[in-house]
Design a protein with these regions (language model features):
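Phosphate-backbone recognition surface of nucleic-acid-processing proteins
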Residues: 83, 89, 94-169, 173, ...
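Intrinsically disordered or highly flexible coil/loop and linker segments, enriched in small
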Residues: 22-25, 59, 154, 158, ...
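N-terminal alpha-helical segment
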Residues: 60, 73-77, 88-92, 158-159
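Short, amphipathic alpha-helical segments that act as regulatory/interfacial helices
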Residues: 13-16, 20-23, 27, 31, ...
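Basic, amphipathic alpha-helical segments enriched in Lys/Arg and hydrophobic/aromatic residues
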Residues: 168-206
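Short, solvent-exposed helix-loop connector elements
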Residues: 1-11, 34, 38-41, 129-132, ...
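Amphipathic alpha-helical interaction segments
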Residues: 11, 45-48, 52, 94, ...
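Long, charge-rich intrinsically disordered scaffolds of nucleic-acid metabolism proteins
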Residues: 1-80
């Protein structure tokens, strides 16, 4: 069963994402209202709504930070995840909530769940087009991993090697970043399993 502190973290992260969507929707409505003949009363209402949503979002963000800082187990896990170059608080907390759920036995299962496994378009017996990510699973986590992969492909020695090798082979940059995202998932899974911080110079041996 999932530990209560992990369930709480997941719930807080979901609420934060929902609030972010609400903020964006309100901003869009406000922009539309300001460009049309919308009554000032409605515009003021939207402005108050946006202000309240931003305050609530900041409050939830603080609750998330406090929760992971004040729980010794979560803090230790988050520190392990953040030892990986490219993994910072945002993606670290998402991966923490996902990996500590207990439903994954391997990093490959996590990558498949997040839709990071390459698939090929097929038509009859022929393969059409380049392989692409399946993009199943939660898009919010995938989006944060993508941002982390952009950083890792420049500053993380292991991730950079994968990225540069694939681009040199003629792979599309987006496909190379997809491979970096998978690598980050494997690294995150690895540090939590071994309880050892990431070692940039570690080379896996067969």
């Amino acid at each position: 069963a999932t530990a209560p502190e992990v369930r709480k973290l997941r719930a807080l992260l979901r609420q934060r994402d929902a609030l972010r969507e609400d903020v964006q929707r309100t901003v869009n409505r406000l922009e539309k209202a300001n460009s049309t003949s919308t009554p000032q009363e409605v515009i003021r209402s939207l402005e108050r709504t946006k202000s309240w949503l931003n305050e609530e979002l900041a409050r939830i963000e603080k609750l998330i930070t406090d929760h992971t800082d004040n729980d010794p187990g979560l803090k230790a896990d988050l520190d392990l995840l953040k030892s990986i170059k490219g993994v910072k608080d945002q993606v670290g907390r998402e991966m923490l909530a996902l990996l500590k759920d207990g439903m994954f036995k391997s990093a490959s299962q996590v990558a498949a769940y997040l839709g990071l496994t390459p698939v090929e378009k097929t038509s009859g017996s022929s393969v059409r087009g380049r392989p692409h990510m399946s993009k199943t699973g939660p898009s919010g986590v995938r989006a944060k991993l993508y941002v982390a992969a952009l950083t890792a492909s420049r500053w993380n020695k292991q991730a950079k090697a994968i990225y540069e090798r694939l681009v040199a082979k003629g792979k599309a940059k987006k496909a190379a970043l997809g491979a970096v995202m998978r690598k980050l998932v494997h690294l995150c899974f690895g540090v939590l399993k071994t309880r050892l911080p990431w070692d940039e110079n570690y080379v896996a041996t067969a």
